[in-house]
A protein has these predicted regions:
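N-terminal intrinsically disordered/low-complexity leader segments
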Residues: 1-20
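Amphipathic, non-transmembrane alpha-helical scaffold segments
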Residues: 17, 25, 67, 71, ...
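Helix-turn-helix
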Residues: 23, 31-65, 69
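Hydrophobic alpha-helical connector segments
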Residues: 69, 83-112, 152, 156-159
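Amphipathic alpha-helical packing segments from all-alpha helical-bundle domains
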Residues: 76-79, 83, 104, 125-151
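Amphipathic alpha-helical segments used for helix-helix packing
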Residues: 107-129
Length: 159
C-alpha cells in the first residue's frame, strides 16, 4: 500500500486508522444485520469495505472482535439520547426529546436495530457484561430521575 511507503505524521496515520476502522464497522454492520453473526464471514466484511482480509485482520483479529465493536458502537449511539436526559429539565420536554431521538435512530439505522434485536433474541452473549454493568447503572440512574419527577409532582405516578 502506498501509505506504508511514505512518511506520515502520527496524526495523519491515526486519522487514516480511524477512517479504516469506521469503514470496517460500517461494512460489518451491513453484513451482520443481513446474515447474522454465524452466517457472516470476515471475507464478506472485507469485500464490502474494499479491503483484503489480511488488511482487515490488522485492525480486528477475529470476527468476534468486529461483532462486539459493532454492537458497542451501536449501543453508544443509542444510549446518547438517554445520557442527555437532564434531571433539571422539564420532564415532558426531556422525555419527548429522548423518544424522538430513539425513533429517528431506528428509522435512520434499521440495520443497527435489526442487529441489536437479533443479539438480544440470541441471549446477548456478546454484550452481556455491558448490559449487566454500565447499561444497568445508566438505566437505574435515569429511572431515579423519573422517580424524582414523579415525587415532585412533575409527572403522574404509574404502577
Amino acid at each position: 500500500m502506498l501509505l506504508h511507503s511514505c512518511q506520515l505524521g502520527p496524526e495523519i496515520g491515526e486519522d487514516i486508522s480511524n477512517f479504516v476502522v469506521i469503514l470496517i464497522l460500517d461494512a460489518a454492520l451491513e453484513v451482520f444485520s443481513a446474515y447474522g453473526f454465524r452466517g457472516s464471514t470476515v471475507d464478506q466484511i472485507a469485500s464490502r469495505c474494499g479491503l483484503s482480509k489480511p488488511n482487515l485482520l490488522y485492525y480486528f483479529r477475529r470476527k468476534e472482535d468486529i461483532y462486539v465493536a459493532v454492537l458497542e458502537r451501536t449501543l453508544d449511539d443509542w444510549l446518547e439520547p438517554l445520557r442527555r436526559i437532564d434531571a433539571a429539565g422539564e420532564p415532558i420536554e426531556e422525555l419527548t426529546r429522548y423518544v424522538s431521538a430513539k425513533i429517528r435512530l431506528s428509522r435512520e439505522r434499521p440495520e443497527a436495530s435489526r442487529l441489536f434485536a437479533n443479539e438480544i433474541l440470541h441471549g446477548a452473549s456478546a454484550i452481556g457484561n455491558f448490559l449487566k454493568g454500565p447499561l444497568k447503572k445508566l438505566v437505574d440512574d435515569k429511572a431515579a430521575v423519573i422517580a424524582g419527577w414523579m415525587a415532585e409532582g412533575k409527572l403522574a405516578r404509574i404502577d
